[in-house]
Amino acid sequence: IELAFDFVNALNHPERRARLEKRGLYDGRSFTKDSRIALVLAGYTEDEITGEYIKKLKRKRDKAATDAIFIEGVIGGSRRTENGKKIFSLWDTYVYADFVTYPSCWEGWGNQFLEALRAKLPIMLFEYPVFKADIEDKGFSVVSLGSELADSEDGLVLVPARKIEEAADQAVDLLTDFTLREEVVESNFKIGRRHYSLDALSKYLLPIIDGRQ
């Protein structure tokens, strides 16, 4: 998750904010000096039993003044009211998102990746091992942080600074160029449907069921 903090901080660099302000956003919205580039952490944040990971993230946020908002307390699998408190669906957050960050260093596969494809949002990700082994060759267009990690002094991880800078520049284009954005998200959606939809599932299962594999 800390890699997403670095990504947002790079987007908030004055030069990139100036580009966003000059071009305006992909959907016609203006971007002004008062506009926020916020990282919203909506889903479950994995942690150690000690809770130290979240503490480290919040220290990093506060030190760099990252606009990061933890809202997992009001997000659930579906909309409901719990003890008088409104709980929103994770899908509600996708409606308001302009970009999905998926900086996981390790995943069993990557369901959140599929969610981002379905929501038709551009994706920034770290090339975790399963992505490289099972997903990368399908041809998805993503903003990549590469696949090299290093430990940082604060007990978190980092990637080469140039990868963060390159990712932020690509994100500016996807946030401001409607045509480019549509080409990317529509192409990703079609690739996802071809390989990972329920229709595609039958292609993988039938040979097994028929004993042909």
Q: Predicted regions span which residues?
A:
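Nucleotide-activated donor-binding/catalytic signature segment of Leloir-type glycosyltransferases, i.e.
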Residues: 26-92, 96-99, 141
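Short hydrophobic beta-strand element within catalytic cores of glycosyltransferases
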Residues: 102, 122-125, 132-136, 142-147
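A structural motif in glycosyltransferase catalytic domains
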Residues: 1-7, 39, 116, 167, ...
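Short alpha-helical segment that forms part of, or immediately flanks, the ligand-binding pocket
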Residues: 91, 114-118, 132-133
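A charged, aromatic-enriched C-terminal amphipathic alpha-helix characteristic of glycosyltransferases
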Residues: 161-166, 175-209
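C-terminal "capping" alpha-helix adjacent to the active site of nucleotide-linked donor transferases
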Residues: 144-180
